[in-house]
């Protein structure tokens, strides 16, 4: 991916020199021209076409921000309630992710959402130990992690 992106920037800068016009519009035109060239050459360049990976990373960021906003509202509801009826507790989340960086990324995303903290990962890397501020919603929490965060982390990892 990095090789393709650097090559695209080199083509865009080369386009500026060839056209002898150093404007932003011309750079964008050169970048689009480079994008087409990199796409035509992506079979001989290492890795998957970088736009696909870039799209997946942007999708990961958007999904995480949505989950972050939802978790903020959940914690806000707990804080605003006059009586405390939440049940904090620990649970084990079983993951299917294989690569270490994917497990670390998922753990960080879980920790960054309010109301949950990852305490550790098992030695065989199949279980993530999580503390939740409201244990009564464990099934919802597991389903939310499985269908959104873990799914998109797996997609980003498919190279």
Curated annotation (Swiss-Prot):
Taxonomic superkingdom: Bacteria
Keyword Transport set for record: yes
GO-annotated cellular components: plasma membrane
Compartments, as annotated in UniProt: Cell membrane
UniProt key word Membrane: yes
Function in brief: Mnh complex is a Na(+)/H(+) antiporter involved in Na(+) excretion.
Annotated family: Belongs to the CPA3 antiporters (TC 2.A.63) subunit E family.
Protein name as it appears in the record: Na(+)/H(+) antiporter subunit E1
Organism classification: Bacteria, Bacillati, Bacillota, Bacilli, Bacillales
